[in-house]
Amino acid sequence: MAPDPSRRLCLLLLLLLSCRLVPASADGNSLSPLNPLVWLWPPKTSDSLEGPVSKPQNSSPVQSTENPTTHVVPQDGLTEQQTTPASSELPPEEEEEEDQKAGQGGSPATPAVPIPLVAPAASPDMKEENVAGVGAKILNVAQGIRSFVQLWDEDSTIGHSAGTEVPDSSIPTVLPSPAELSSAPQGSKTTLWLSSAIPSSPDAQTTEAGTLAVPTQLPPFQSNLQAPLGRPSAPPDFPGRAFLSSSTDQGSSWGNQEPPRQPQHLEGKGFLPMTARSSQQHRHSDVHSDIHGHVPLLPLVTGPLVTASLSVHGLLSVPSSDPSGQLSQVAALPGFPGTWVSHVAPSSGTGLSNDSALAGNGSLTSTSRCLPLPPTLTLCSRLGIGHFWLPNHLHHTDSVEVEATVQAWGRFLHTNCHPFLAWFFCLLLAPSCGPGPPPPLPPCRQFCEALEDECWNYLAGDRLPVVCASLPSQEDGYCVFIGPAAENVAEEVGLLQLLGDPLPEKISQIDDPHVGPAYIFGPDSNSGQVAQYHFPKLFFRDFSLLFHVRPATEAAGVLFAITDAAQVVVSLGVKLSEVRDGQQNISLLYTEPGASQTQTGASFRLPAFVGQWTHFALSVDGGSVALYVDCEEFQRVPFARASQGLELERGAGLFVGQAGTADPDKFQGMISELKVRKTPRVSPVHCLDEEDDDEDRASGDFGSGFEESSKSHKEDTSLLPGLPQPPPVTSPPLAGGSTTEDPRTEETEEDAAVDSIGAETLPGTGSSGAWDEAIQNPGRGLIKGGMKGQKGEPGAQGPPGPAGPQGPAGPVVQSPNSQPVPGAQGPPGPQGPPGKDGTPGRDGEPGDPGEDGRPGDTGPQGFPGTPGDVGPKGEKGDPGIGPRGPPGPPGPPGPSFRQDKLTFIDMEGSGFSGDIESLRGPRGFPGPPGPPGVPGLPGEPGRFGINGSYAPGPAGLPGVPGKEGPPGFPGPPGPPGPPGKEGPPGVAGQKGSVGDVGIPGPKGSKGDLGPIGMPGKSGLAGSPGPVGPPGPPGPPGPPGPGFAAGFDDMEGSGIPLWTTARSSDGLQGPPGSPGLKGDPGVAGLPGAKGEVGADGAQGIPGPPGREGAAGSPGPKGEKGMPGEKGNPGKDGVGRPGLPGPPGPPGPVIYVSSEDKAIVSTPGPEGKPGYAGFPGPAGPKGDLGSKGEQGLPGPKGEKGEPGTIFSPDGRALGHPQKGAKGEPGFRGPPGPYGRPGHKGEIGFPGRPGRPGTNGLKGEKGEPGDASLGFSMRGLPGPPGPPGPPGPPGMPIYDSNAFVESGRPGLPGQQGVQGPSGPKGDKGEVGPPGPPGQFPIDLFHLEAEMKGDKGDRGDAGQKGERGEPGAPGGGFFSSSVPGPPGPPGYPGIPGPKGESIRGPPGPPGPQGPPGIGYEGRQGPPGPPGPPGPPSFPGPHRQTVSVPGPPGPPGPPGPPGAMGASAGQVRIWATYQTMLDKIREVPEGWLIFVAEREELYVRVRNGFRKVLLEARTALPRGTGNEVAALQPPLVQLHEGSPYTRREYSYSTARPWRADDILANPPRLPDRQPYPGVPHHHSSYVHLPPARPTLSLAHTHQDFQPVLHLVALNTPLSGGMRGIRGADFQCFQQARAVGLSGTFRAFLSSRLQDLYSIVRRADRGSVPIVNLKDEVLSPSWDSLFSGSQGQLQPGARIFSFDGRDVLRHPAWPQKSVWHGSDPSGRRLMESYCETWRTETTGATGQASSLLSGRLLEQKAASCHNSYIVLCIENSFMTSFSK
């Protein structure tokens, strides 16, 4: 049963009535039952949740609760479900009973419709209604009506499908509060959104019977019917997830409550169902008002409908306020400082893209399970992942598959080849279970590609478990990208980074021959990025901006700008002002945060440079801004700004060539370089092109057509380590210059002298730019502007300048080979500390004999003993202590107070000053002359003269002598000196008094032998014992331990003598016999010192004893008493030592190769220096390596005669002149010189080219053969001089650049040409008159075969013959054709002057000519005999005569034909290369294969520019003209089929047509259908029209060449740059100047994008022989898989056909692309870097005639690699 239309009409009227009643509601806090749509418009204020409501029958009072519930009444027999009760007064059971009663009672009102009493505030900060306008309200009403109708239809359908009649009752509906719905216009849409839970009551207001329930919108978080909708108070914070906000206000619906950390559980239901998680997902989005997704109004019905709705609309995009309509949010990654995570979502997308290979909505939504993370996935657990979804993005359905994948990739995961490798795999394998619904966020495609780029060498042929192309992109998918944070950006950002790749629309790249790659900006160019991708949030405090630009207009334009997020204010930028009066400003735009309009921080005015390439840079350093123009500081101005730096807003824009909407002025012109550097320093290395050592520049960067121009790089003074910077040199002020004081401080000036390039340059380098002629005045502006003029003549030598002030001490050269130079002698240093004790000296001389001892008692006479052994040496005595001695003589010069080595700045005159003055002592005495000093280093560059001359000035006066250096610090103790000489014997001391006798002590037991004690003092003599009876003489005893009679035995030595004790003097008894030796007695106490006895008589000197053995050192004795002061010794007199050996070589200073001329040649002779002390003798150094020959230095003034001093100071003779040195190496070629003056009149030129064929003359009477050829005619007079030819191109060779050479000597007789075929001997005929036919009739008749005919009668004059067809050059004789199209303009040359010269020597005999047989004309009247013709070398011959015609009457004499003997005609280009040496200089060569004309020149040949081809007209009746010219074979070999052009083949003149090493094309076998010639005779096949093999193009039209490399390559090409470089090399080798790049896709480029956009649609693709392969580049990618023209050939750079030559056995070509030219990342041999068998690359078979056939082949194969010319460039731009 269909729904009743009347009921539907009533429903619509009810809705309209409700809409009209809304504004009439006076109480915003009440809700009328007649106003069911009041929730469509939120009230202005809402602070209470309670309010009056009409109470229906059988309803309960509505209770306000904090936990609102959803009440759903089952329909059609469905299970009745409800949630937790909202009121404590009604338990669930009672509430259920109430509902049942309401449904079963007599009242027709069935299910209750809970309506919120009061709408809560939409936001705590919202004070007023966010009105979207009347249009939004109308759209809401219309949407509600549409949902009502849909609800009614579905209700009727459900009721009838159940088989029962549904009464008129309202469907249970949940109405959201007014504040929980927010709308925002988006185009023509209004989006409604539920942002919070829905308060309801089971006993809320219901509608009456017979009416429909109020329609409602299905919330995006619609839950299961039993799921309590708990609302988190804040978005959860999970690792790697960024919950984004798109709110435009500052309000937050989250409050300050703690977010939940785990997914919410249901009682017994596990995790939240899918719909409940959807609510969590969207609440986390922190949505307020600006929502970018349209959510349709859906009815709340039963499960199947909910499931179907959620499958389509359940996954809603996270909204964004980004202007592009896409979400782009940056969040920090926990635990990884300096990273950012980007979540990207489309404006209306719902997850992954449709073509994604990952698990889609179906696999990750309907069957998703949240499981605990397996313990084996520790890699992911470290990232904070505890639970993960299955199935994951790799379609794994259980943990076993996940663990197997981790185990398979375990080794790769531990390589750490990418800083976020673990994040990538965990996002794929174990997506974290969050409060949001599945599918979770997968990694972005860019994330995958970045990982592949970093880890490709670790994959080793394997691939990632996911194809990067299957992942969503940042632009079109909802994904995660983790990359480096903006705070980790490089210190320099270049132009390519700022523009992006690919280039934006309306910005094109060109290769400028002077500056290289440049980018063209027009009025429609548009480039913009987010600034935080390249710069940190807090921009650099000090920085520099470098530009290389060429403005095209005089209008103002912004070069670079960083704007705020609204693009209203330029925070940082550079702008060129409009040109006025030949001047323009360069302004630095710098706006502090908070300003309402753009501010100008600094501005500089300088001459306009429109149309000129100009280098300039802005350096922001502290409180100043400096402008550098062409690498020279132009001006510096103060700059006031805040101290905290420039803070960029979130979403700040970055623009090149414009400023977005912040400034309407766009830059128009070209930009070659733009750099933003973190350092404020600007040096020549920075502001000039510093990418000379690039990095892989192949033809893709500069292209093979890029002409590397020689740039004059300035010298970087930092290459000389440690050399002091010269002080700033300024030009003298001129009239008109500003006198404004430089605002820089002294410290700034000093820094600028070192860090900036200033206005000074090294000698000879000059400065480049448009302001070279202008006078530079740093800090005061540019005084004189204008273009750079020619270099002036050197100025006159100026007078010597005055002596400069004494400069400060410079730095020290830290060179390992430097040698200190002795300075002036300083004062003597303070006395050092006493040295260590020296080694013991030798024994002294024997002392004087001592006093006679007392006569002892006469003992018994013993036997003489044997000589005793030498005793041990005694210990050294303690040193004496006496008063301080007088000061010693001055010592040698001490070491320098600096530890590093000295240089020229430490020599005399270096000028120390400052604190060193306080250390200086009194002036010492002048020392002897010192040795010659080392050569000095080059001085500072002199200031420029007024006239700008760079010639060196005269040498300055010598500087004043420097101050003496300070005294040196005390040196370290020296090593022990050698033993001194023996001193004289000392004076004997006085004899001491006798001491008292000590009391003997008790006798102790015998102890062990103790160590030898110190010598004691002499004791008193003991009492003599009784004399015993003499015993018998004993035998001689053994040698005793006697002591040598030396120093120890003298008086006072302190060593006791072992003697027997004596008793008191008794009577002398008889001699007794010697007794036995007794034990040693106890040593007595030391006795008192005895008195000094009187001097005894001098005894007889005893014999010297033997030297005793060295004893072991004894213990140190006690300190003795101070000895008496000795007399001073005599001064030693020593002779001066011998001169020391030669000192080490002088300091070696590192210099660059450009400075060798300054250092390696002797400088000017200086004045003799002050004599110094002789330096210490140093060790002889090793022989150094031979230095390179330096360039001659500037000639200095002649110095005074010098004097050479010897090391000891003596003056030697004058220096002698040395032997003549060897000649130096040849210097490099100099720069190109300027054009020279007009030359003098040259010698006569060579004969000109033969003229065009003349008109066909009337046939003359046959000549008389009797005259024959017995005599040669006389040479005719010389012709008039020809017109002046164009000037020749300058020839550049490796030795020099020659502008114009002198005329050479006349050439010798050329080589005789090959003789023609021998013809039949004919009879001599009479000489005939010269006709107008442009061939040699004599030679023609000589070759004709026939009998002599009789002389005919004089016939009547015949009619004039029909005019011939337009001329065909060498193949026919006719009048000239119509003029062709205008040719390319030639190079203008100076007007030439010439004189008539003598005739040249006769050339060699040329080969036979070629031609066609003409039609026979009517006989003409006989003519009189003509004069003989010119000699043979000046005739044009025809090797194939026509049949003889009938004799006719004699005709009038014709004019002399043109000479054509100096032309060689060859069939192929290779033949010309083989035989070009046989052709004399000045001859022409015509190559039939190419239809090109060349001229033989000295050491080569040159191509001749021809006019446009004029096609032969059809339908003239001329059979010869209508036929294809026959193939001509004039040499041994196989010919090619000639191509017929119906249009011009003229190319513009180009210098690269001259090949230094022209290619040698291999001789080919003829193609099928072409006869093979075995001789040099001309072969004439039957004349018939032929067609060329392939379509050809017109040479004057733009074309793109497709050429193959000379060898096949495998997949390992060293990347796309390696393949590009081979295309570049081989193209240059054969003289092709275009930009050739490999016909390959790679990671960074699609094959389709290689060719310039402007040349893709209309420029044909041709091969090396200009045969058309494809109509255009676009046609290759039009779906035909790169279909080529039928019969197309592809040649290599060396001219071989790759389809027929065996060098390419496999006729396939690599391309790595799909049919549309997009890169196939899974099939390009790992970015063309591997040749393993397992890797594959996309290839195509050329046998099928296609270039983009889809065939995956192993990278181990060697296939053809093609090179495509990526842009058409005229010859003038190459």
UniProtKB/Swiss-Prot annotation:
Region (Nonhelical region 6 (NC6)) spans which residues? 1205-1217
Keywords annotated in UniProt: Basement membrane, Cell adhesion, Collagen, Disulfide bond, Extracellular matrix, Glycoprotein, Hydroxylation, Metal-binding, Phosphoprotein, Proteoglycan, Repeat, Secreted, Signal, Zinc
Cysteine disulfide links: C370-C433, C380-C426, C417-C455, C444-C479, C448-C468, C1623-C1763, C1725-C1755
- Where are the stretches annotated Nonhelical region 7 (NC7)? 1291-1300
Comp. bias intervals (Polar residues): 55-87, 244-256
Which spans does this entry mark as compositional bias, Basic and acidic residues? 708-717, 839-855, 1338-1362
Q: Where is this region: Nonhelical region 8 (NC8)?
A: 1334-1345
Q: What is this protein called?
A: Collagen alpha-1(XVIII) chain
What species is this protein from? Mus musculus (Mouse)
- What taxonomic ancestry is recorded? Eukaryota, Metazoa, Chordata, Craniata, Vertebrata
